[in-house]
UniProtKB/Swiss-Prot annotation:
UniProt name for this protein: NADH-quinone oxidoreductase subunit K
Keyword Cell membrane on entry: yes
Gene transcribed to yield this protein: nuoK
HAMAP family (alphabetical): NDH1_NuoK (MF_01456)
Subcellular location: Cell inner membrane
Species the sequence originates in: Caulobacter vibrioides (strain NA1000 / CB15N)
Documented EC number(s): 7.1.1.-
PANTHER family listed in its UniProt record: NADH DEHYDROGENASE SUBUNIT 4L-RELATED, NADH-UBIQUINONE OXIDOREDUCTASE SUBUNIT ND4L
Amino acid sequence: MIGLPHYLVVAAILFTIGVFGIFVNRKNVIVILMSIELILLAVNINLVAFSAYLHDVAGQIFAMFVLTVAAAEAAVGLAILVTFFRNRGDIAVDDASMMKG
C-alpha cells in the first residue's frame, strides 16, 4: 500500500528538480516558469498527502486554491513572455531589466 512517506518522497524529488531547474537555467524564462510550477506541484502533493493522512479536508481545499493561483501565475507569466518576445525577439532573463514601467 502506498503510504504517506511515498508521497513525501515524490514531493521532495519534484521540489528538488524544480529548485535545481531554477538554479541551473537562469537564462531561460520558460524553464524558470516550469520549475516554479514543479515546486508548486510538490507543495500540492504534500498538502493533499497530509490532508488524507490526517483525515482533514482543509489541505485539499487549500491545494485547490494553490492550483488556481498557479494557473493564473502561469497565464500571466506566459502573456508577459509572449509580449516580451514580440518586442525584443529574445526571451533572455538578462534583457528583462530593460523593460519599461
